[in-house]
Amino acid sequence: MRPRCCILALVCWITVFLLQCSKGTTDAPVGSGLWLCQPTPRCGNKIYNPSEQCCYDDAILSLKETRRCGSTCTFWPCFELCCPESFGPQQKFLVKLRVLGMKSQCHLSPISRSCTRNRRHVLYP
């Protein structure tokens, strides 16, 4: 009787072992809908393609699009920020780099360049 008990215990152990090994295939998601690995990027309530576009002030822009920063600079809103450095009659602006993966803010971002007014003397013939 003792060998029969050992055989039964061995069969039970093998069965439990095989069930545990095959558990990975039973945990697969079930459903007929589209299954995405990453969340879809949104700008407000609109979907956009981050390899061609970006979200800037709840507007979808092309990665190539530029904007004015002060009266003397242009910047790429998808990659840079236009930050006021001083206020008053002679406003100064800085263009700073956006930090990827974060909501960029002027006081935390590294400086790319200064937008100072270049005073050029134009000579007319």
Swiss-Prot record:
Signal peptide: 1-24
Family matches, as InterPro entries: IGFL (IPR032744)
This protein's record includes keyword Metal-binding: no
GO molecular function per UniProt: signaling receptor binding
Pfam family, one: IGFL
Entry GO CC: extracellular space
Name the record gives this protein: Insulin growth factor-like family member 3
Organism: Homo sapiens (Human)
